């Protein structure tokens, strides 16, 4: 076998930016490996900030920025970060990104920033963020790491937004602050807002219903007893 033939055989086709493997990094967290309903991470935010859709959307976009940015930075630095201080480096990177998010919210969305309160700062300790940095970004190239961050952020986001839609609609009769039930005249017919939907336990129950529906549809997610 000639040297040229051997070199040709050793060459592998270049993987596309959105190859099947890379697409799975986006699609899997939306369902089969959802960070909230399957891995049971980030539950605190689902309980605390899903009273209104606006808060859920802003928190979701904040996590998207932090996770994608953190994954990218850690992946770029993965070969130069000493193993013994990797957690510290990850925390510094995430903290810097969270500070940026917090300042932007204070400048452009002060009302939402006040409502979210300390929960934006607590993104630093979000298990989804630290888990993806440690489990994926440290061992993979920048592009897959960015896709992983995007996929897990979207998996986190759709759960928060769905929970917020149910809680705000049935608890306040609004969606994203716009009155929905009042123009329909339902209050005149005797309908009353369900104030229980505003309470944190209802967020947990709503997440539980989503988990039940998800596992009823996808039986492979059911844990073996």
Region spans (language model):
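Structural signature of hydrophobic alpha-helical transmembrane segments
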Residues: 53-69, 89, 113-124
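Intrinsically disordered, low-complexity non-transmembrane regions of multi-pass membrane transporters
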Residues: 1-27, 218-225
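C-terminal ends of transmembrane helices
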Residues: 70-83, 130-140, 215
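Cytoplasmic-side transmembrane-helix entry/capping segments in multi-pass membrane proteins
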Residues: 81-94, 115-121, 148
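The first (N-terminal) embedded transmembrane alpha-helix
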Residues: 30-49, 60-64
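Transmembrane alpha-helix boundary signature
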Residues: 100-115
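Hydrophobic core segments of alpha-helical transmembrane domains in multi-pass membrane transport
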Residues: 42-47, 63-64, 68, 95-102, ...
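Short, membrane-exposed interhelical loops at transmembrane-helix boundaries
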Residues: 176-196
